[in-house]
Amino acid sequence: MEGQAVTTNPWLIMAINMTVVFAVLIALGILMEIVHLIDPTKKKKEAPAATAPVATPTATPVAPANASAQNEDEVVAAIVGAIVAMGYSSEQIASIRPTATSAKWRLEGRLSGRG
């Protein structure tokens, strides 16, 4: 093998190997960015709809017919408000349900006639 220059320096071999590895990683990163830019499955951005400011109605003290229903509406409104604050729209919320039903919730449902 007199025609080929062979090195036995481990530092040079390490530098060449690491250069190849990082060059491939950079190439993969660029390829991922290109695919991200031309992704045909990505939803198109819709123009933001101009929303008119909603006038807040004045609060009128009315005795609720069912305190449980009002409490449930307030809880749902608080959950929807928290989700909307995180960046989701109210149209994206499919349902609100507890992750695990406890004995207290089951009893509440039976006593209020929903179970």
Curated annotation (Swiss-Prot):
Regulation: Completely inhibited by avidin.
Catalytic activity: (S)-methylmalonyl-CoA + Na(+)(in) + H(+)(out) = propanoyl-CoA + Na(+)(out) + CO2
Listed transmembrane segments: 11-31
InterPro entries in alphabetical order: Na_pump_deCOase
Keyword ATP-binding: no
Main subcellular localisation: membrane
Subcellular location: Cell membrane
Positions with biased composition (Low complexity): 48-65
Top EC class for this record: translocase
A GO term, aspect molecular function: sodium ion transmembrane transporter activity
Any single Gene Ontology cellular-component annotation: plasma membrane
EC code: 7.2.4.3
Pfam families membership: OAD_gamma (PF04277)
Stretches the record annotates as Disordered: 46-70
Membrane topology of the entry: Single-pass membrane protein
Quaternary organization: The methylmalonyl-CoA decarboxylase is composed of five subunits: the carboxyltransferase alpha subunit (MmdA), the tunnel beta subunit (MmdB), the biotin-containing gamma subunit (MmdC), and the delta (MmdD) and epsilon (MmdE) subunits.
Function comment: Subunit of the sodium ion pump methylmalonyl-CoA decarboxylase, which converts the chemical energy of a decarboxylation reaction into an electrochemical gradient of Na(+) ions across the cytoplasmic membrane, thereby creating a sodium ion motive force that is used for ATP synthesis. The delta subunit is required for catalytic activity as well as for the proper assembly of the individual subunits to an enzyme complex. Can also convert malonyl-CoA into acetyl-CoA.
Annotated family: Belongs to the OadG family.
Protein name (database record): Methylmalonyl-CoA decarboxylase subunit delta
